[in-house]
Amino acid sequence: MKNIIRYAMAALLSAGISSCSFINVDPLSEIPKDQMWQNQRDVNAGIAEIYSSFRTALRSNYFSWGEMRSDNFVLYQELPSEFRNLILNQMTTDLACTNWASLYKVISNTNFAIKNIPGADIADQALKDDYLAQAYAMRGLCYFYAVRVWGAVPVYLEPVDNIANAEIKGRTPMEEVLRDVIIPDLEMAESLVNPSNVERKRISRAAIYCILADAQMWLGDNEAADATIDRFMAAYGSPAAPKSNSKYIFEPDIVKLKNSFVNHLNGVAGDNNPTVDEYGEPNEFIFVIHQNISEAGLNNYSMIWNVYGCGMGQGSTVVLSPKLQAIYEESVGKTPVDLRFENYLCGSKSSMESYQVHKYMANGASVNYQDVINCETDYPVYRYTDVILMQAEIKAKLDKWQEALNLVQFVLNRAGVASKIAKISDFSTRDELVDYILDQKQIEQVGEAKRWFDLVRNHRVVEVMNPINGIDSQSQELFPINQTILDLSQGAYEQNIGY
């Protein structure tokens, strides 16, 4: 019993503990209660630990869960690795990405925060409410990742105060978790969050809108998702009419957008102040997983170098799939030339036989390993372009076809290919328009951990992936549950179908 709780519900870690040893750390309930959650300093530390554990959980899983099972990438070299299994659809129950323990550690941290923050001695009620908003939103986001990866998952909404009395809960269906846990958590966060919180490394009201709209799309409630994005644009401006005082904008200049991916946080001192935007100027990023070893320790260096490559002529774990490479190459073989080719990609070797994603490094640059891990490289969870393309998909499903294409137009304008926008007459069915939007998302958001989730949400996995790696069943949209979790669950969980 103790082992499963240590795996699925491990509690707050002390600073400096490595991610590989978390199952040996005493849970929060074994720390004397009078030493925790008493004042603003304690609460601030607890919230910081939520984000720290989230960084650890997503450091590699960001790529495993959102990218590597899709049609975006192939292996650069045929070496044994988790990504190899994912790309080839050789899913086994010993893969690290099939273990939900690190994600439930974040959830455990949020549960302790939600229970204890109301009783903390914090005179500023707006600040206390914002701390609660962070916890509710991060719990909602973690469960959102969980249901997209495994479908039905166990739900814990209370902290485990005593591991001897802890209950191993069964799995709750995905739709129920979305409807009864994730969306209510995000709505609670929206009601509590301080609108002046603009730091992109933490949850803001803008980020809550993004997660909420995304979750509503997965529930199939497109009207609600459309209304949520309308609230976002009312608060922060639309791509056609940005607000002058908004920190979140659709960046129409691809060079400035590239700079946001590459440079904006390098050398900027952390301020630990959520009302100050460390980026210093409006840009696309809304919520990011901030990788910075000087702030978060050696276990939180960015894996961009390892996965996508370190620059011109250098190796990487993966390169563009032949399918996606052909799409990009076709885009630069015509006039006008798509500017994303030179800003998002580079040749993986001198013969230019294949291409790496190069969004996160300056054009023409080659960066050594040590420099990359010292860079403050962010993994984007949501940026303004997400909002636009999510709403385009929503509009298509609501049969507002021209509105959907108008939104895609903004993205193509920035890419320098405005004239290549499709026309309504090009489509005979709603599904054809949705496929077109998903294709545009694939080109624009390559390397941002979106493609697999887009395929799963729209039930395109078998259609797209069967010719590539043989996926032949909708059940394979889900990941298997790690065998260690099953062994320790005492029969509470059944393996996902097909594994």
List each model region and its residues:
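Bacterial Sec-dependent N-terminal signal peptides
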Residues: 1-30
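Elongated scaffold/linker segments in the mid-to-C-terminal portions of large proteins
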Residues: 38-42, 47, 51, 58, ...
